[in-house]
């Protein structure tokens, strides 16, 4: 059962694209449209990902930032995440106007994270590649990987855990430490088929 209708997913992707283009070209932060569906004012976690069109998977990512927790209305969070992904991802320089025609926009709407309980060595059995995203936390360190990432890279559950630890700036086996907290979540993902093209629900398996 989907929480996000296909037409809402398309609305969010178009909104993210507009937010990015207005900010990159004009330095303007757009307001939520008047025709925003009421359901999209509910608070939800969301990430916006920018990919280089037709680039190999290892080279495709151009920016990805979002909010794991439902702290903003989804429509507002999408605008914020889109702009941040375009100009504030510390891994990349800000997106330039001439790049906009070569980037696809992807929006992932997240469920609230839930802790994975039990002995650490059982954690791989409690997650599923193609369904779950992960958050790893220990002390001041935290890292998140979206559900599509292990699918795109061909990881199994243990490698997914190790890579999320690495993303947090921790040793790759930190998921075996009882002091490390691991959370899982799911996401409904919508993407442009090509820059400014039709929007589709992204299958993970």
UniProtKB/Swiss-Prot annotation:
Domain AMMECR1 span(s) in chain numbering: 7-201
Pfam short name (any one): AMMECR1
Gene3D superfamilies, per database record: Hypothetical protein ph0010, domain 1 (3.30.700.20), Hypothetical protein ph0010, domain 2 (3.30.1490.150)
Coiled coil: none
InterPro entries per the UniProt record, alphabetical: AMMECR1 (IPR023473), AMMECR1_dom_sf (IPR036071), AMMECR1_domain (IPR002733), AMMECR1_N (IPR027485), AmmeMemoSam_A (IPR027623), Uncharacterised_MJ0810 (IPR023472)
Protein name, entry field: Protein TGAM_1450
Species in which this protein is naturally found: Thermococcus gammatolerans (strain DSM 15229 / JCM 11827 / EJ3)
PROSITE patterns the UniProt entry points to: AMMECR1 (PS51112)
